[in-house]
Amino acid sequence: MSMPLASDDALQAGVGDGHSWTVLTRVPAAPRQSLLWLPALGVAARHYLPLAEALAAQGMAVFLHEWRGNGSSTLRASRMQDWGYRHLLCEDLPASHARLAQHGALPLAIGGQSLGGQVACCHAALHPQAFARLWLVASGTAYWRCFAAPRRYLLPLAYRLLP
């Protein structure tokens, strides 16, 4: 049985350099947990709405972050406009994360696809107390056979033993 949605709207977010964007939301009437989702590189947040709707039907409030230069972002990459990971990790993601506060103190997961998953890992590492879970889809990890010995042989063990 799917849950009725209480909110299918958007939250406006922005940072001091003038960049603003829309955080798309799908919030069920009685959410049990929430997810801040980071898209793959070059993919607008709106393409994840079917995922957000499916998760919301299962009781999860979903918030879709928008990358600089994509979708609702007021910026576009050009020779006159440049940004890097510092902008994403220290400005944009904290602003999107802060917009979730109005939905209460639900257990929060962060996740993403591809580059979004890698940046989600970095953001979670910078704010370890903020997230209960990390969701990754096709986010790439270092393949153990690419490393020289002895690290090559220690990595599979580390992958199995780390939480």
List where the protein language model places each region.
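Alpha/beta-hydrolase fold nucleophile elbow
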Residues: 103-114
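Active-site glycine-rich loops that stabilize anionic/oxyanionic intermediates
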Residues: 32, 40-43
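Proline/glycine-enriched tight loop/beta-turn segments at coil->beta junctions
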Residues: 27-34
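Conserved alpha/beta-hydrolase
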Residues: 45-47, 52-78
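N-terminal cap/lid segment of alpha/beta-hydrolase-fold proteins
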Residues: 1-27
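Alpha/beta-hydrolase-fold enzymes
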Residues: 115-163
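The conserved beta1-alpha1 loop
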Residues: 36-40, 66, 113
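Alpha/beta-hydrolase active-site loop
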Residues: 82-101
